[in-house]
Amino acid sequence: MRTPVVMTLGMVLTPCGLLLNLVSTLAPGWRLVKGFLDQPVDVVLYQGLWDICREQSSRERECGQPDEWNYFQTQPVQVARGLMITSLATTALGLLLASLGVRCWQDEPHYGLAGLSGVVFFVAGLFSLIPVSWYNHFLSDPDVLAAPSSPVTVQVSYSLVLGYLGSCLLLLGGFSLALSFAPWCEERCRRCRKAPPAGPRRSSISTVYVDWPEPALTPAIKYYSDGQHRPPPTAEHRDTSKLKVGFPMPRPPPKSYTNPMDVLEGEEKKTATSQGGSSSRSTRPCQNSLPCDSDL
């Protein structure tokens, strides 16, 4: 898997910010002082947090100059020393966390750890930005930052500029790495939705059961409402009340007897002889093979 862009950007900006802050802390170049009355015109003093250097065009730079104005005892210098060292230590901790979070030897990055390193870098940038801004605010104030009287000129030197750049790089790199919290939070929310509830879910609305008194009914209404006026079902009704299971089968059509012989054959002869009397009707044999009416 490719490293996300926010992690790559953060891992590029934060080491650069650490390097610039380190140079700004150690180099004697926070303030430039020139224009001394009792010194040559080309004499320049570079004041830092730990040392003061003297530079002249005809000579090389000489460091370790004595502090004639109690410059190192001023409050902005003392605070800047402590905060810049704290910023360097915090940045080193952030690099350690970022190395573990931005997987250099794993397939998947640890988004939570990378986001935490971004927060640490952001705090480190604030630790370095506060003393740099405070020092720059009182740069030309002799009551806060000790300096010789006029016509001495006080200017910003290179270490202060490097401190500004290093702080901004740490802030940007920390913010970029802190964006790694977005996929981490999304994954956590997805797991919380899929996880089953730990216990039985309680309803937010409680159900209240109220036993209302039954209304008093007249004897006639109670008699008819209870069904007492209905006679008990008979056996015939019980049989018909049973449910019939299944589906109706088709019934075959009724069968009828068909005679292939003509049943009216011989009826004319029987009609002619019927006048002879009833006795002769019963004694004559029937010429039809079918049963005759006299046989019935």
UniProtKB/Swiss-Prot annotation:
It comes from Mus musculus. InterPro entries: Claudin (IPR006187), Claudin_CS (IPR017974), PMP22/EMP/MP20/Claudin (IPR004031). This is Claudin-23. One of its GO terms (biological process) is calcium-independent cell-cell adhesion via plasma membrane cell-adhesion molecules. It comes from the Eukaryota. One of its GO terms (molecular function) is identical protein binding. Its main location: other. Residues 1-2, 103-111, 182-296 are cytoplasmic. Belongs to the claudin family.
